[in-house]
């Protein structure tokens, strides 16, 4: 019931849930593990949650009676052809013929999920789900129709056994030993685990009474900098039990080895441990935590340094591929849309793990109502739209687009509601206009050419997705908006003398600054004709390989 195999499903049945709900719930678990020097540090953007009541339904046509097994995470009822069954049946026999099977689950703590197994009746993504069936019963006892109910296809991953409950999912772990242990002249012990890693420190043969301090670092200097290292833990040992002082959690020592593993994971190479004289620590090791992945991409050449760069890059990518694609293992460990879109592109060549891409896209979108940009950052909202475009182009997964489309529409409605009189976006109150961690001053005022180009591509993405799901009115709407915005890009931002897009326009006046951002993406998206591309400063710098560079931005 803990860590599960992540191979593709080979079973007919699987645990199912409302699409996006499990991903949002799981993401909340991960995003709220961040600490700043022992202090809990939750995200500063809106945190959504799962629907607490979900109905699962399936239309059946059975050639013979069939017994089914039912499991659920939550309190549930079962209706067959509109009639409630007694209690919460674990098994029931369905008669032959056409029937409607409905299972409604309530769970306040974790997403409502179900697992149904029979000869032909099995829970999978073909089941329909809703968070409000809108079925009421009038004074005569007649039930209303549910024609106003919005149903979705069920969400699932690969929890294919009855005991593989989604809420119990954890990443895999394996024990790793430090490659060296060095007593320090100023006191304490420095442990080197050989390379950057991620997991949980384990203390063995732990006894006595007193405080233990654990400091983490990418270098010996950082780990030993007790006042300024990014991450640390503090423990108190007494009477065969350990209290983690950061999270106020007390646990007994495990088994005869008097072993204790910290509950909070950390990223590190070096670990520096000090303790009071009354405490004895035997061995220090770690439990390495990871998402198992199949390496589908590889690289090898006659330059060993380049080979090593590839190996380190692939390992780094794997470290940040966890329940979701995260920005980095050390500090934030959050899901940021700008970091995620880069991870998606690298993933398509290294792992081609589409499930992790979809989980991350669901989490970053969250739920309605939309009250801010993704991660509060304007450009990150547009990266979110672009990530859907890229995912479809690499996977051809039309079903995912169909599932996500309503939330794409409401996200774009939010953006369109914040455009100015020119139909362009500019930073408003509450918006973080990010662009880049740039050296020196980077003007964020007015209409930024970079933001308009991302906005235009997002509108084109909406038109593509509308066409994929058969929304002809939507396609016409978004095509018109994209064309109108695209037609304004050159008149507003193109500087003939510089042969480039300038950085921004304030009150209708072009700035003198030329930055790489708009010019790069205009080349990637082929928004410039051949002549302008030839003169574009970015194209001049990368004349041959500019298209391939997009995969690694």
What are these regions (language model features)?
Residues 1-13:
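Bacterial Sec-dependent N-terminal signal peptides
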Residues 320-328, 368:
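Short amphipathic alpha-helical segments and their helix-coil junctions
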Residues 3, 75, 108, 209-210, ...:
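Generic hydrophobic alpha-helical segments
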Residues 329-331, 335:
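Glycine/proline-enriched, intrinsically flexible loops and inter-domain linkers
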Residues 335-553:
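Active-site core of glycosidic bond-cleaving carbohydrate-active enzymes
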Residues 11-323, 339, 355-360, 399, ...:
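Extracellular/oxidizing-compartment recognition motifs
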Residues 53-55, 87, 184-186, 329, ...:
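Short, solvent-exposed coil/turn segments
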